[in-house]
C-alpha cells in the first residue's frame, strides 16, 4: 500500500494530513481487533457474500471470508475518498464529484485497474453540441386542392381547356390552404376566405376560352374531381375522388337541345349566368344555357338495364320520339310513341300536364308502369329513362317560358333568367334504406363576389 503524503506540494492541508496518518492508524486498529469487532461491520456481509457467489468457480464460502472482504473494502474506500478530497480542495469546492475520483485514480498507480470503470471527463469524447432544432409546427397541415369542373374539361389552377392552355394568376400557396379552382365568366379574381385557425380557402376563377355560354357536347369528356395532396417532403399526389351520385331515375331537361340527342343515365348540371345573358340580350344575341354532363360508365348502364328488365318482368318501355311544343310555342299536342301499353292520364301521382296535352294521349308519365303505393319496389331497383328529343329549337329565347312536366312531379313555375335552376335526381339507396325526398342540387349563378355555388338537400 502506498504511504505517500500527498500530491508533492509543500503546503499541507487537512486532507493531506489525514492521508499521511491514514495507514499507521489503520495498522493500529487491525492489531487491536477482537472477536466482538468482527460481528459488526460497516458494509453488509450478505451483499458481499452474494457478490462472491457470482463466480461460478466458488462452490462454498467460509464464514470468515465475508468479514475479511468487508474490512478490506472499507479501508480501500476510505483511502480513495481521501485522495479525491485533496483534488476537491485544490479546486476550492466543498462537494466531492465524480471528476475528483477520476483524478485520484489517474495520479496513483495502485488505482490503475479502475481507469476503465471511472474514466476521466477529459478523456471522454466531447459532448455533442446541441443541434439547433428547427421549429416544427405541431401537425403540419397538408395542402388540399379541389377542382370543381363547371366545363366539360376540368379547370385547375393552371389547366387546359378546348385544347388551349388557360393561364390563371400565380398564387403563393401557404401551408394549411385549401385551393378551389372554378371556371367562371369574366376576369380571373382570386378570392380568399378565412375558414378556421391556420386554414384558408382560396377560390380561383378562370375564364374559359371562346363563347362560354355555348352548349358543349359532353362526348368523351367527363367531370372528374381530383384531390392533390402535397406531403411534407414536397411530393404531389393526385387521388381521384369518387362521386356518390347514385343511379339516376328521373332526368329533367331544362335547356335547348340541338339536333337529336339520346339521354341515357346522365347527370346534367344546369347553370345560367345572369350577367352574360343580359349582355347578350342587349346585343340581340339569344341566351343559351351552359350544359355539363357526367357520363356514367358503360358497366353501370348495363347493370341498371338488367336490374330494370328484371323489375318490370321484361316489359321495358322505350320512348322513341318526343316533341316539345312548349319550347317552340306551337299549339301542337305532345305526342309520344311508346312500345307498350299506354294508359290515359289517370295516374295516381299528382301530375300537372301542359295546356297542349290531350286527354287520353300517351305521355311519359303515363307510359311508366303503374306501381302500388302499398308495395313499393325494392330500393336497389333501377329505373332508367331513355328519351330521344328531336324537333327542338337550337336556341332558347329570353322571353319564352319553359315548362317541363316530369313523371310524378307537379308542374313548376316558369323559369326566368334571374331564377335559380335545380337538378332533380332520385338516388337509389342500398337495401334497407329509403330516401324520403329527392335531392335538389342548386347550380346558382356565380355572383360577382366569387363565392362558390351552394348545394342544398331537402
From Swiss-Prot:
Q: Which Gene3D superfamilies match?
A: Histone, subunit A
Record-linked Pfam families: Histone
Main site of residence?
Answer: nucleus
Q: Which proteins does it associate with, and in what oligomeric form? A: Heterotrimeric transcription factor composed of three components, NF-YA, NF-YB and NF-YC. NF-YB and NF-YC must interact and dimerize for NF-YA association and DNA binding.
PANTHER family, A to Z: HISTONE-LIKE TRANSCRIPTION FACTOR CCAAT-RELATED, NUCLEAR TRANSCRIPTION FACTOR Y SUBUNIT GAMMA
The organism named in the record is Homo sapiens
Q: Which family is this sequence assigned to?
A: Belongs to the NFYC/HAP5 subunit family.
The protein's name in its UniProt record: Nuclear transcription factor Y subunit gamma
Q: What spans are recorded as compositionally biased (Polar residues)?
A: 339-351
- One of the record's GO cellular component terms: RNA polymerase II transcription regulator complex
Residue stretches of biased makeup (Low complexity)? 305-315
Question: What residue spans carry the region label Disordered?
Answer: 305-379
Give the gene that encodes this protein. Answer: NFYC
The organism's place on the tree of life at top rank: Eukaryota
Kindly list the biological process annotations in GO that this record carries: positive regulation of transcription by RNA polymerase II; protein folding; regulation of DNA-templated transcription; regulation of transcription by RNA polymerase II
Amino acid at each position: 500500500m502506498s504511504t505517500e503524503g500527498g500530491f508533492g506540494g509543500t503546503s499541507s492541508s487537512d486532507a493531506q494530513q489525514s492521508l499521511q496518518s491514514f495507514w499507521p492508524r489503520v495498522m493500529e486498529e487491525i492489531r487491536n481487533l477482537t472477536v466482538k469487532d468482527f460481528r459488526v461491520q460497516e458494509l453488509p456481509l450478505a451483499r458481499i457474500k452474494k457478490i462472491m457467489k457470482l463466480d461460478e468457480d466458488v462452490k462454498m464460502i467460509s464464514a470468515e471470508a465475508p468479514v475479511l472482504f468487508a474490512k478490506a473494502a472499507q479501508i480501500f474506500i476510505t483511502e480513495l475518498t481521501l485522495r479525491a478530497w485533496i483534488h476537491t480542495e485544490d479546486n476550492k469546492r466543498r462537494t466531492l464529484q465524480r471528476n475528483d475520483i477520476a483524478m485520484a485514480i489517474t495520479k496513483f498507480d495502485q488505482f490503475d485497474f479502475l481507469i476503465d470503470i471511472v474514466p476521466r471527463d477529459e478523456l471522454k469524447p466531447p459532448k455533442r453540441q446541441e443541434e439547433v432544432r428547427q421549429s416544427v409546427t405541431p401537425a403540419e397541415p397538408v395542402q388540399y386542392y379541389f377542382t370543381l369542373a363547371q366545363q366539360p374539361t376540368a379547370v385547375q389552377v393552371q389547366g387546359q381547356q378546348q385544347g388551349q392552355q388557360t393561364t390563371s394568376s400565380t398564387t403563393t400557396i401557404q401551408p394549411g390552404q385549401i385551393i378551389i379552382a372554378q371556371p367562371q365568366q369574366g376576369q380571373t379574381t382570386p378570392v380568399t376566405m378565412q375558414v378556421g385557425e391556420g386554414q384558408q380557402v382560396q377560390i380561383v376563377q378562370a375564364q374559359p376560352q371562346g363563347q362560354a355560354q355555348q352548349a358543349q357536347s359532353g362526348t368523351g369528356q367527363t367531370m372528374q374531381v381530383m384531390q392533390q395532396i402535397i406531403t411534407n417532403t414536397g411530393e404531389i399526389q393526385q387521388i381521384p375522388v369518387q362521386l356518390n351520385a347514385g343511379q339516376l331515375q328521373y332526368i329533367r331537361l331544362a335547356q335547348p337541345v340541338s339536333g337529336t340527342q339520346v339521354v341515357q343515365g346522365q347527370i346534367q348540371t344546369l347553370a345560367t349566368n345572369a350577367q352574360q345573358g343580359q349582355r347578350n340580350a342587349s346585343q340581340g344575341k339569344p341566351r343559351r344555357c351552359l350544359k355539363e354532363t357526367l357520363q356514367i360508365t358503360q358497366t353501370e348502364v348495363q347493370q341498371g338495364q338488367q336490374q330494370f328488365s328484371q323489375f318490370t318482368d321484361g316489359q321495358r318501355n322505350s320512348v322513341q320520339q318526343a316533341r316539345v311544343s312548349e319550347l317552340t310555342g306551337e299549339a301542337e299536342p305532345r305526342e309520344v310513341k311508346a312500345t307498350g301499353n299506354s294508359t290515359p292520364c289517370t295516374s295516381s301521382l299528382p301530375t300537372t300536364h301542359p295546356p297542349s296535352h290531350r286527354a287520353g294521349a300517351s305521355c311519359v308519365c303515363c307510359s311508366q308502369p303503374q306501381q302500388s303505393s302499398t308495395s313499393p319496389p325494392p330500393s336497389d331497383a333501377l329505373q332508367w329513362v331513355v328519351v330521344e328529343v328531336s324537333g327542338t329549337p337550337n336556341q332558347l329565347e329570353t322571353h319564352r317560358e319553359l315548362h317541363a312536366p316530369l313523371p310524378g312531379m307537379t308542374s313548376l313555375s316558369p323559369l326566368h333568367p334571374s331564377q335559380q335552376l335545380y337538378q332533380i335526381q332520385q338516388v337509389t339507396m342500398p337495401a334497407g334504406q329509403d330516401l324520403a325526398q329527392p335531392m335538389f342540387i342548386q347550380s346558382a349563378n356565380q355572383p360577382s363576389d366569387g363565392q362558390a355555388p351552394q348545394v342544398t338537400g331537402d
